[in-house]
Every structure is written in C-alpha cells, then in structure tokens.
Amino acid sequence: MTDALLPANLNAKRLSEQNYFRKGKSIAQTGRSKLQNQRAILNQQILKAMRMRAGAENLLRATANNKIREQVLLELSFVNSNLQRLKEELERLNISVEVYQHTEQASNIPLIPLGLKETKDVDFTTAFKDFILEHYSEDASEYENELADLMDLRQACRTPSRDEAGVELLVSYFQQLGYLENRFFPPSRNIGILFTWYDSFTGVPVSQPNISLEKASILFNIAALYSQIGTRCNRQTKIGLEEAVTTFQKAAGVLNYLKETFTHTPSYDMSPAMLGALIKMLLAEAHECYFEKMILSGIQNEFCTLLKAAQEAAKVSEVHMQVYTLMNQAPIKENVPYSWSVMVQVKAEHYKALANYFVAITLIDYQLNLSDDEDKQEKAISQLYDSMPEGLTAQTILKDQQQRTLLGKAHLSKAIRSHEEAIRFSTLCSTLRQIDVLQLILSAFHQRSLLKFSQHQKPDDFLDLLSAPDIVSKTEYQAETIPPQLSKDKVTDIFQRLGPLSIFSVKQRWSAPRKMCITKEDGDFGFVLKGDCPVQVISLDPLCPAATEGLKEGDYIVSVAGKDCKWCSTSQVMDMLQETGQDSIEIQVISIQDQTNSLANKSATYYAGMQKTYSLVCLTMDNDKNTKTQKATKKLSFLSWGFKNRQKAASTICLPSEVKGKPKTDMVFSFPDNSLSTESALY
C-alpha cells in the first residue's frame, strides 16, 4: 500500500485510477462468491420472516379475541417453521467446506473456515456533503471524486479476493475508517448514516449509526478471510502446511484483537464468548496442520519417534475436545452451527484414534536391538502415561514381548472404538454425511486399524482383560495468536484535501474561508507565521494593513494567491508570499469556531424487525448540571434491556437511562493523535 505522504498535487488522480481498491471479485466469479450471494439472499429472507414473527407476536398480545388468537397462533407456527428452515439453510452454507479446500486435498479432513459477514449498502454522499459544508465550511461538490472512491472501496470490500491482496483491501478500508471516524463522526451527535451488518451465524441484522460497528465487522471479515486462505492452502506440501499454520494463527490474532478492543459488540458472532470459541477453533486447526506437516513425509519407524507422534496426535485431539466443550456451552450452543460442533467432535475422536494406533504399532512391531538406547526408550514409555497399567513397569514393557503385545492390542482396540465413534458422530449429522472426503478418510483409517488388529488376533483374545490407559498429550508446538499488523502500511487518506487530520477533524469546527489582500509595509507584512500544515498567524501588528483587512491573530492560512497551502510548512508559505515579487497578495484564512455543546443524541443498536431492542450506550454532554450532586444509575446491558421492554411495541426503540455522575471525559470519544485509533466510546 502507499504511504500516507503529502502528494505534490492533491487533485492529480482519483484513488480508483491508481488501482487503490481494484482487488474485489465479482459477486458471480467464484464458487465462494456464489455462496456469499446466497448468504445475502438468505439474510434478507430471514429479516422478512423475523418482521412477520414480530408483527404476529404484537397482534397476539394486543387482541383478546379467541378466534383471532387461534389464526395468529397458526400463522406464527408457519412463520417459525419457515424461519427454522432458513436458519438451517444458513448453517448449510457455513459448513460448505468443500468450496474452500484446495483442489488436490483428497486425503485430508476438511478444515472449517469462517464465512464473511454480509452488509447493506451505505450512502455516504448526503451526510458527508452536509458535514463538509457545515463543519469545514467548504464546497462539498468539490469532493465528489473522494465520495465515489469511498463508496467503491466499501463495495469492493464485500467480495475481497481470497489472497493477501484481499486482506490488504480490507485492512486499507479499516485504516480509512480510522480517518473517517476522526473527520466525520463527532461524539456529540449522529450524522445520519446507519450501518447494517448481518450476523454470520444467525443471519439477524444489526443496525447502528456508529462507525464502530463497521470497524468491528471489517475486523471479523479480515479474520474470516485469513481462515479461508488457510483452508485453501495445499496441505500436501510442507510449504502449504506452514502457510496454513501461520494463516490460522493470524486469523485467531485478528479475532483476539477484536475481542479485546470492542468489548460490548451488538451481534452474537462478535460476542466475547463466541469469539473465544472461534479463536480456540482456529488455533486447533493450526495445531492440526502442524501435526499434518510432522507426518507428511512419513514417520520414521523408530520407537521414540512413533511415541512422539502419538503424543502429538493426542494433543490435537485434546484441543479439539476443548473447542467442542466451548461450543456446547450457552449461549454459544444456540448460535454456532450444529455441524461445526459435530465436526470438531469427529476430529477429537479421529486424532485420539490415531494416537492409540501409533502407540499400538510401536509396541506390537517393536524389536529390541543391542544398539537401542534403553534408557531413552524407558523414559519415553514412562512419559506416555500418567500412571502405568496395573502390574507393569516401563522396563517390563520393554523386556517382555508378550506383555508389550497385549498392551499394544489394547491400544489398537481403543483406536478402533474411537474410529467407530468418529464415524457414528459424522453419520448423525446430515450435513457431514454429504461430505464424501470426510467419510472416505474416516472409513480408510478405520479399516487400517481393523486390518492391523486382525493380523494379531488369536482365538483366546477374549481372555485378555488388559485396558489401555489414556495417552498423555505432549507437543513441541505452541499455538499462539499472531497480532494483526493493521498499521504496518499506511494508506492515503481519501479526504486528505480537507487538510492535516491533526487539525482538520471533528474536534475543531472551522469558519468559512475569508479572502483578503495583504500589503507589505516597509518590506514586512506585519505578522509572524508558526507551525506546519497549516501555518498559523501570530504576533500580528494591530496597525498593519493585514489587520485592517480583517486578519486576526490565531488565523490559519489555507491559500496563497489561489494555491492551496493546508499541507505546506512555514518556510513553504513564506516562499509563496515572497515569490510573487509584489507588495500585495491575496490569501485565504480560516479560524476555529467555538464548539457549542449540545445534548448528545442517544445511540441505540437494534435488530431490525425484532421485538427486542439492544441498547448500548447513551452519551450525554449536559454541562448545565452539577455532576457531583447526581447519583449514578446502573446501566443495563444491551441484552437485559431488550428483555425488560418486552411489553413495548416492536417499533419503539427503547433506551436506558443515561449514565449520570460520570466525569465529562468519560462521556465523549477520545481522539488520540493516532488517526487510526480503534478506541470508541460506543464499544
């Protein structure tokens, strides 16, 4: 991406002409895009069904006529049935893993990618034009190109390419949102722009007039895109598996950043509990790819190496079981796709079976050689279990071929049971039954274990009562999140012509430019300039011609002889004033206007068409009251508030009492010097 440097000509080219965002894919170009298109259609159908259900529930509460109530209840049952069908369709899209896998991956269990969140179109034109005219006192018609670039950039972000270029596109838009937040979104009021995003799992729309929802959703999509890239990596090569491990760690890192930065998100897919489960799932998939890399070229038929592979497989099983446990806790269980939790459970059993299989072939096929390091092998066995089988020691297992074989067959029997459990779980889910690759892999590994068991089966095996203990998981790989590099490559601020962001932001309101002709007197204009980008007038001689023309101390010079100088340094402006060679020159100046604090508009997040209203934060800037004498009112969470107002009409946006007694600094947004700050009072 390009650096955020001052261009020589701010009007030179539109960003679209510089290939700034030509990285989005057409909605019908790829199978993945077709799935995303189907998701958008389903989201609209879910929204319609939820509105119908909300209307029916309102009518049910409003009427006492038994006949009408019976008709409404019948209609409500049809609506709920249709809504359930639509959500099952959405779940089917979420588990359409074949589209995301590499074309040559016919011997790997499919990985689970995250789907991109869908959004509705947003028209920035009217609101931004009004704000430019009102706040910056500039002709908004001169920013048509910038507005068009912004709209095109957002549209391109809806279908990013599944590669690093697509990630760069989303990151660049996220950085632009940081600029936009500081230029156009004052903390004291809403400017009339409503952002709507659909929940990735439930399809429920969430609307909010705050840019923080946009930023959080883009972060979620960056993580989703990383997960899709990781899923697409070629897992038949070492390089492909290493790339998959790194990419899944990056995806988990973005979600972790989202979880820590936006702590009160309005949709279920970005709630802390759900994000925690998704992070665990992505790291489990990274661990899975690491294990596949470890056994890619085959496992050396060596005692300690095989036991090490067994413990690595046990670790993969363990992390997937942890993910399964998280996915079966409320409220995650109600929102995560059922097929996802079953897939995770299948993987947990599958890798548990692999761990027992590796131990089994190690014990059964092992032959003691004089060159073997017995101490090392004995240590490996002692670290394999928390407690040794009854009556056995590590040395006994090494020395006694019969006991070693019996223990190996016990592990083999345990592997077969785990394979059968994995197959049973996969057949219980209709969606997983249709994934042919998964069924073939599970069946092949099951048959391999059965074949190995049959080779060592004897008629009196039913007398062997030895039970294989659980394998202690152990790994040399630590699956950790990789923090996102969201500010690594600075992008060009689309609205940089408004001026440097440190000065021309929502924090300062500017007067309209004032034209004046200043004249030298005794070779001097009668004032001093300071600062850079833009320069400020100080030490103004009240008797000089410039003061007579209306120049005031503290004014900022934005134009000299018709040339924009908002981005010019003091020396550059001085050169512009002197280079004309004339005693008089025309300049334009602006001054900061007093900020009039008014009561901030209350901002509510709500689910369109739903009876519940999810209110987040009410901002206030009431300076007339003494905050020391006010009592703090407990602020309700956005979920509890919706339940409290069940009896109110669906069309009413319910807002909690404003938080009193807080310092003024806690009630407004903070805008640090970094224009890409993701801090937001709403989140």
Swiss-Prot record:
SMART domains: BRO1 (SM01041), Hr1 (SM00742), PDZ (SM00228). Its main location: cytoplasm. This is Rhophilin-2-B. Residues 25-99 form the REM-1 domain. CDD domains: BRO1_Rhophilin_2, PDZ_rhophilin-like. Binds specifically to GTP-Rho. Signal peptide: none annotated.
